């Protein structure tokens, strides 16, 4: 009887060790769940970014307005016959003073 009790206690101790400290333990499980959450957040951000890029590609393929806007903003280009004005001033935000 003592031998059976000893075997059961040893088995219980071994199972507890594996549960708390061994490979695939609860700590590892919690760590993996946290990594999954972080990866899902990263994936959601990338999906949103991809959607924006798809829309931009669609705009560039469909018409010249998006291409013209990009050329104006990024390259500083102007149409023939246009005059470019650069307003240099303070950080008032375009609010006129009375």
UniProtKB/Swiss-Prot annotation:
Summary of the function given for this chain in its UniProt record: Essential cell division protein. May link together the upstream cell division proteins, which are predominantly cytoplasmic, with the downstream cell division proteins, which are predominantly periplasmic.
SUBUNIT field: Part of a complex composed of FtsB, FtsL and FtsQ.
Hydrolase listed as a keyword: no
Stretches of the chain found on the membrane's Periplasmic side: 22-98
Recorded coiled-coil stretches: 31-74
UniProt keyword ATP-binding present: no
GO terms for biological process, alphabetical: FtsZ-dependent cytokinesis
Organism of origin: Shewanella pealeana (strain ATCC 700345 / ANG-SQ1)
Membrane topology note: Single-pass type II membrane protein
Keywords, in A-Z order: Cell cycle, Cell division, Cell inner membrane, Cell membrane, Coiled coil, Membrane, Transmembrane, Transmembrane helix
Family: Belongs to the FtsB family.
Highest taxon listed in the record's lineage: Bacteria
Membrane-traversing stretches: 4-21
Originating gene: ftsB
PANTHER family in the cross-refs: CELL DIVISION PROTEIN FTSB
The name this protein goes by in its record: Cell division protein FtsB
